[in-house]
Amino acid sequence: MPAPGAPLSRTSRLLLLLLFKVSVSAALSFVPEPRNGTCLGESCSPLIPRRSRDAGGPRNSARDALRVHVPREKLEAEVRGATSWDLPPPRGGDTGVIEEAAASGPLGPPTKPPGAWRWKGAQGKEPSGHLGRREPTDSQLFRQTSERGEMSSKRDEIPQGSQEHSVKTEPEPRDLFYWPRKTGQLQGSHYRPSAVHEGRTLAPPGRALPQNGSADDWVPDQGGPRRGNSTNRRVRLKNPFYPLTQESYGAYAVMCLSVVIFGTGIIGNLAVMCIVCHNYYMRSISNSLLANLAFWDFLIIFFCLPLVIFHELTKKWLLEDFSCKIVPYIEVASLGVTTFTLCALCIDRFRAATNVQMYYEMIENCSSTTAKLAVIWVGALLLALPEVVLRQLSKEDLGFSGQAPAERCVIKISPDLPDTIYVLALTYDGARLWWYFGCYFCLPTLFTITCSLVTARKIRKAEKASTRGNKRQIHLESQMNCTVVALTILYGFCIIPENICNIVTAYMATGVSQQTMDLLNIISQFLLFFKSCVTPVLLFCLCRPFSRAFMECCCCCCEECIQKSSTVTSDDNDNEYTTELELSPFSTIRREMSTFASVGTHC
């Protein structure tokens, strides 16, 4: 028979077991499960399945029963090993703090979709004194990227002066994750390029890039020599006249000499062209050739002389590459025109000396004269065309701060030319020295001297067998022959330095200094201008018809000259026209002189 207190003791034991079971179950409900890296929101929290079991009734009782028998030490180890999502681990490593943090609220990020309100709540939970560096999620990267874009747009709106003060150097509490910016930007640096400069080369402080964006050729902001191909910088040209030095005296001498050549050449060549064009009785084939020569001399002096003098004084071409190409082209074309004109004059004088009466009775029409001039022009322009291809503008630094580099027009073939033109340019460059010497020096001098000697012999024979009426014409032919020889000697004397310069450049360039080459070049240039200036003066001195017409042209505006010329008788006028026309008494033009005299003018 059981004792009377046995049921009571059994009941108390059952109650103790039940109480122990309930306490263990309550402790297991707070144990966090290992967090899955792929879950988001409250689904990662162990409270959700626990609450679902409490609401829906007991489920998985077998697993719950197994958890009852798990030792307490293992449960505490799992609690210690579980990492918190929102709160950082305490420095002291106290397990009680971990349990309080786990029991105080749900673990992991909120379950609501990411948005501005969600991250504002997250910002308030993060302490300001510690920053955790861990791998962010996609939503966190999206938020930080959007915030960076907003900050860059705001920074563009802020002025440059206040932008540097607004850049933060330390992270704020609202930043979830903080790491250094992109490569090339140091942490805490105040230098933040704006979005408008992306993809461009930025110069370091104190330097300014040239306009083409090249980082190699930098241009300093202030002071120092300027380099690079910037078009905004202002370069000072050298003043050749101040201060007074040996170079400035040379510049004054060059300037005075060029003014004399310019004035004399312009007036003389214009006078020759006006005399031939405005006087009908001066329109012979020989005078037309001389007028053509005067036109090219005028072109050389009017166009090339100022450019060459400007380059000599400032070491800079006024029109840069255009003047570097066009000035040598016009000069070589002028040499060709002079060469062919002298040859044509020699042939014309030889025909006149062979049969004087027949020559002066023959009249050449305008088309014949134009055809001869066209042959001279086309031949000279075509032969000078390779000079345009060979000439290149070269710049050399003088070594002075703020001064423009010296520009030189050198013979250099560009590799960008087409293959055919490039081969022709190479061939011409190899044969240029002897072509220049043979065509522009030997041909006019030898041919003219030979023809002049033959013409002089013909004139002597004609003078012995001539009648009284032809002696005046033979004397005029002798004057014209001497004029052609004088023009040839002047031309040969002025072209010799150019050939010497070419020979020195081709064979002795290494042993001659650049200063000597520049001196030879400027001497050859001035002798070419001197030839163009002296040619009309030589015509007025040696050719009587030109001198008489020039004096009449100069005195045509004077009333005394006009009144004096009106008192001359008609016979004297006929003799004057006969002399100027170089006509014989048997010429048919003499009978028509009264008709053409009223058409022509003396100026």
From Swiss-Prot:
Residue segments, region Disordered: 39-232
Recorded GO MF terms: G protein-coupled peptide receptor activity; heat shock protein binding; Hsp70 protein binding; neuropeptide binding; neuropeptide receptor activity; PDZ domain binding; peptide binding; prosaposin receptor activity
Keywords: Cell membrane, Cell projection, Disulfide bond, Endoplasmic reticulum, G-protein coupled receptor, Glycoprotein, Membrane, Receptor, Signal, Synapse, Transducer, Transmembrane, Transmembrane helix, Ubl conjugation
Membrane-topology descriptor: Multi-pass membrane protein
Extracellular side: 27-255, 311-325, 391-433, 505-521
UniProt subcellular location: Cell projection, Dendrite; Synapse; Cell membrane; Endoplasmic reticulum membrane
A GO cellular-component term linked to this record: endoplasmic reticulum membrane
Regions of compositional bias (Basic and acidic residues) in chain numbering: 51-79, 145-158, 165-175
Tissue note: Highly expressed in the brain. High levels of expression were seen in fiber tracts such as the corpus callosum, anterior commissure, fornix, internal capsule, cerebral peduncles, and stria terminalis. Additionally, moderate levels of expression were seen in the pyramidal tracts and cerebellar peduncles, as well as in the spinal tract of the trigeminal nerve and the spinal fasciculi.
Cytoplasmic side: 277-289, 347-369, 455-483, 543-603
GO biological process: adenylate cyclase-inhibiting G protein-coupled receptor signaling pathway; cellular response to reactive oxygen species; dendrite development; dopamine biosynthetic process; locomotion involved in locomotory behavior; neuropeptide signaling pathway; positive regulation of dopamine metabolic process; positive regulation of MAPK cascade
Endpoints of the signal sequence: 1-26
Reported modifications of this chain: The N-terminus is cleaved by ADAM10 metalloproteinase; mediating limited proteolysis leading to the release of receptor ectodomain by shedding. In addition, cleaved by FURIN between Arg-53 and Asp-54.
Transmembrane segments: 256-276, 290-310, 326-346, 370-390, 434-454, 484-504, 522-542
SS bonds (residue pairs): C324-C409
One Pfam family it belongs to: 7tm_1
InterPro entries tied to this protein: GPCR_Rhodpsn, GPCR_Rhodpsn_7TM, GPR37_orph
Domain of life: Eukaryota
Keyword Calcium tagged: no
Coiled coil: none
Site, Cleavage: residue positions: R53, D54, E164, H165
Annotated glycan sites: N36, N212, N229
Known function: G-protein-coupled receptor that plays a role in several physiological pathways such as resolution of inflammatory pain and oligodendrocyte differentiation. Acts as a receptor for several ligands including prosaposin, osteocalcin or neuroprotectin D1. Ligand binding induces endocytosis, followed by an ERK phosphorylation cascade. Acts as a receptor for osteocalcin (OCN) to regulate oligodendrocyte differentiation and central nervous system myelination.
Subunit (UniProt): Forms a complex with PRKN, STUB1 and HSP70. The amount of STUB1 in the complex increases during ER stress. STUB1 promotes the dissociation of HSP70 from PRKN, thus facilitating PRKN-mediated GPR37 ubiquitination. Interacts with PACRG.
Family as reported in the entry's similarity comment: Belongs to the G-protein coupled receptor 1 family.
UniProt-recorded name of the protein: Prosaposin receptor GPR37
Upper lineage: Eukaryota, Metazoa, Chordata, Craniata, Vertebrata
